[in-house]
């Protein structure tokens, strides 16, 4: 879970761990922490995940939301002002909007807000925040006007209780699926999942064996089983090369919105 990508990076940059998982790329502040700690790292995307935006099962008016509408709902200026569905789009009913999502410490929150509201902006504070996705499911499924978001895998587990929305990121309405997440057409809410490996630990046999296992083609079945979307083999070849070459630093931290993983790895 990404309950705290931030905490994991803090430990990693302090030299307490050899490998850190991240449900988002390393942040500028963490790059500085690692620099201070003298930690060089290899950045490896290992799978894709998409964020699902869901509404109550009985919602019969919303099927696709534009990213601009999501922004209107979640931006800080919406606090106490955008309270009903008809304020999101004329034609939607005058029904109370109930918002549910992960807390501000989570990688999922960061990723959603950066791509929907904007970098370093944050969100309105008057929503029901929980680090437990199950509580978000419960909230949306019992609130007729509910809307929430979390990882795609979690929607798959709970799809009988919720309605999945399509998202229009500028090229028409697209629903998240293993296909649209892997090929990047579900944007801007599909993302890579990472591991960061401490450079000086990368040659240790047990660390190398663990990373090789994570990057092996045979691992894609396991990735699917835990609810993520495997990366296409042409991308995984570039990731394996990055590890075997010991290429340090980040290409994802300041990548422009909507960048393709393959393009970044080929830089």
Where are these regions (language model features)?
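Flexible loop/hinge segments at secondary-structure junctions
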Residues: 1-267
């Amino acid at each position: 879970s990404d309950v705290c990508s931030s905490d994991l990076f803090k430990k990693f940059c302090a030299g307490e761990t050899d490998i850190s998982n991240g449900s988002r790329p390393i942040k500028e502040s963490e790059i500085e922490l690692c620099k201070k700690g003298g930690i060089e790292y290899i950045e490896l995307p290992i799978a894709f995940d998409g964020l699902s935006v869901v509404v109550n099962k009985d919602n019969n008016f919303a099927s696709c939301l534009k990213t601009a509408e999501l922004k209107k709902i979640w931006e800080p200026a919406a606090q106490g002002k955008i309270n009903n569905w008809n304020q999101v789009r004329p034609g939607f009913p005058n029904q109370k909007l109930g918002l549910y999502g992960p807390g501000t410490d989570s990688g999922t929150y960061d990723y959603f807000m950066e791509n929907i509201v904007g970098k370093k902006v944050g969100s309105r504070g008057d929503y029901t925040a929980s680090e437990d996705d199950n509580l978000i499911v419960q909230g949306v499924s019992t609130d007729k006007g509910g809307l929430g978001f979390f990882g795609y895998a979690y929607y798959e587990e709970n799809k009988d209780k919720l309605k999945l929305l399509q998202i229009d990121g500028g090229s028409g309405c697209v629903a998240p699926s293993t296909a649209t997440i892997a090929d990047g057409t579900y944007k801007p809410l599909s993302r890579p999942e990472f591991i960061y490996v401490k450079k000086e630990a990368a040659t240790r046999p047990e660390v190398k064996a663990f990373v090789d296992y994570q990057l092996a083609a045979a691992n894609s079945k396991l990735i699917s089983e835990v609810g993520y979307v495997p990366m296409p083999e042409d991308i995984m070849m570039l990731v394996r090369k990055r590890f075997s070459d010991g290429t340090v630093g980040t290409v994802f931290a300041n990548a422009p919105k909507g960048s393709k993983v393959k393009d970044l790895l080929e830089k």
